[in-house]
């Protein structure tokens, strides 16, 4: 049986309404989330039995794509509609034809690495593979990783 997939690219399509897309017989949808960041609204409305491919890798050479952003995109899409990671993919947002070959390869390596990280078996493993500032509120606030203070028995912190 053929897998029907619809690619939505080039800008925000959320104003067309969810039914425009999800009343159609597609099994999965690829959304450009760089040119169309409001497409997250469509992803949030997508039925949980439909696959979602997050086009979250910026196609321009001048941008740096931290893996944490791609991992967040995968996990957020997985959390919508009870979808789960088995129905989520990561992709470049649009063509990489406008950048040189080595930059395109580097972006594709990053995309593959982010997919590997997003598939971590446990939350602890996921946290270990990411920049601590992305998963630890204290580190995010400080702008650097700092272990939390040790706690003494009875709940009081050591200073």
Task: List each language-model region with its residue ranges.
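Short acidic loop-to-helix transition motifs that present clustered carboxylates
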Residues: 11-15, 36-38
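N-terminal active-site wall of soluble small-molecule enzyme domains
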Residues: 1, 13-20
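Short beta-strand/loop segments at the ligand-binding rim of alpha/beta enzyme cores
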Residues: 1-9, 52
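Extended, intrinsically disordered, low-complexity segments
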Residues: 116-159
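Catalytic-face loop-and-helix region of soluble metabolic enzyme cores
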Residues: 20-125
């Amino acid at each position: 049986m053929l897998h029907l997939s619809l690619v939505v690219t080039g800008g925000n399509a959320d104003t067309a309404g969810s039914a425009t897309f999800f009343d159609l017989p597609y099994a999965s949808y690829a959304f450009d989330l760089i040119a169309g960041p409001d497409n997250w609204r469509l992803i949030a409305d997508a039925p949980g039995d439909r696959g979602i491919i997050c086009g979250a890798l910026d196609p321009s050479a001048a941008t740096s794509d931290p893996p944490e952003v791609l991992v967040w995109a995968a996990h957020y899409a997985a959390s919508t509609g009870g979808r789960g990671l088995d129905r989520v993919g990561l992709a470049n947002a649009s063509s990489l034809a406008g950048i040189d070959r080595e930059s395109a390869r580097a972006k594709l390596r990053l995309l593959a690495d982010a997919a590997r990280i997003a598939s971590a078996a446990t939350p602890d493993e996921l946290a270990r593979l990411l920049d601590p500032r992305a998963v630890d509120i204290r580190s995010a606030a400080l702008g650097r990783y700092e272990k939390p203070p040790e706690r003494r028995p009875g709940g009081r912190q050591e200073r």
